[in-house]
Amino acid sequence: MALAAADRATVRALWKKMGSNVGVYATEALERMFLGFPSTTTYFLHLDLSLGSTQVKAHGQKVADALTLAVEHLEDLPRALSALRHRHVRELRVDPASFQLLGHCLLVTPARHFPGDFSPTLHASLVKFLSHVISALASDCR
């Protein structure tokens, strides 16, 4: 099921507001996930996971790029994210629960940075968007 037009518009407006800082916010979300859910670090043992590390920033930018791709292709997330899904599910064998945990952290981060804008409507739209992204990424796990 695709996102409703109002949800798509709300998510796109948030992305526009975040602008060139999407990578910064995605990095913060990763750092939150690593600190709050240490089991997720299992997939990153080869990286320096300290706060502010260049390796976490680089991966945060990859997350940001993937989410931006998703925002640009809201009408067909499974197709847009197919290569990413294949890599994470088939090659890296990421536990789908980790997508949920990152999704939670991706929700908390803009709420912290944009408290005046983080209305119940924005919250709901972002939850729906992240749920669709997670579903598209984890669909091969079923």
UniProtKB/Swiss-Prot annotation:
Gene: HBQ1
Keywords annotated in UniProt: Heme, Iron, Metal-binding, Oxygen transport, Transport
Domain Globin: residue ranges: 2-142
Organism: Equus caballus
GO MF terms held by the record: heme binding; iron ion binding; oxygen binding; oxygen carrier activity
PROSITE patterns attached to this UniProt entry: GLOBIN
Upper taxonomic lineage: Eukaryota, Metazoa, Chordata, Craniata, Vertebrata
GO CC terms in record: haptoglobin-hemoglobin complex; hemoglobin complex
Annotated transmembrane regions: none
Residue numbers binding heme b: 59, 88
Keyword Heme: yes
Protein name: Hemoglobin subunit theta-1
Gene Ontology terms: biological process: cellular oxidant detoxification; hydrogen peroxide catabolic process
Family: Belongs to the globin family.
Keyword Transport tagged: yes
A Pfam family per the record: Globin
